[in-house]
Amino acid sequence: REFLELLTAGILAGGHVLLEDNPGLGKTTVAKAVARLIAGKDGPLVFKRIQFTPDLLPYDITGVDIFDPETRSFRFVPGPVLANIVLADEINRTTPKVQSALLEVMAERQVTIGSSTHRPPEPFFVLATENPVESEGTFPLPAAQLDRFMMRLSLGYPDRETELSILEDNPSENALNALKPVLTFEDFLAARQAAAAVFCHPDLKGAAADIVRDTRIHRAFVLGASPRAGLHYLEALKALALVKGREYVTDEDLAALAVPVLAHRVRLRDPRAQAEKHIREICLARLEGIKTGA
């Protein structure tokens, strides 16, 4: 439930999400389900999956201009990245050149082919995965690309009861295709506007800014979170509050989002250390300061 709440908050906030998890935990199923549950302008949202490999080329994901001999002109064939929901599977298995092509559409919400610019449909959401176990043949994501992801989440393994229900129900592709939209396109846009309008008390907004700034001076980090991280943090806080049925942000929201929003953006001085532990310590210290008036 917590994972779905955070993922929904990321979508409502207009951000992209990085999933760091092992194979077979349902990342593709989650992305497909989201695409089925939100209606687009002309039916369900368009879902595309890109399997990143070392031999992938930029135009494999962005699209390419093809010469049409009948019209004697070039015709643009869109790539899979020009969809509503894009699952970028094992993004760290492709070259930096291809990663930068994905970075452009994530950051600018457009693809440039030659002198032409093409935009993905709205809403546009990238759900990228990387495998933390396998390291051979990978190209680590640069800080600039990691910073484009609003959150990094992990599904994790299901508990025993959930796993038993999976074995008993044996969910199939037919069950996924049977899902019907629960939000119209207009309702989804209204939800995004409602999320942006959620109230955040100046004290909590200040605490969020201080948490981000503290990562830049913390002894455990050689690289702290950027100002963009602060913007993402605030946007995610408001969206999560709406998901939980509130019109205001609480300190619980700050604690819930500190690690998902900030941990993937920092660089550790000691690679054996855990960024999550230090982020939690920073967050708790700032929240205690609010309670004590410090």
Question: Across the structure, where does each feature detected by a protein language model lie?
Answer:
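C-terminal engagement/docking regions of AAA+ P-loop ATPases
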Residues: 217-294
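Walker B catalytic acidic pair
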Residues: 21, 89-90, 101
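Conserved alpha-helical scaffold flanking the Walker A/P-loop in AAA+ ATPase domains
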Residues: 5-9, 67-87, 116
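Canonical AAA+ ATPase core
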Residues: 68-72, 94-98, 106-198, 238-241
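Walker A/P-loop
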Residues: 8-53
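Dynamic helix-loop-helix/coil hinge segments at AAA+ ATPase domain boundaries and subdomain interfaces
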Residues: 1-3, 198-199
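P-loop (Walker A) phosphate-binding loop of NTP-binding proteins
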Residues: 22, 61, 129
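Conserved AAA+ P-loop NTPase core
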Residues: 49-80, 137-146
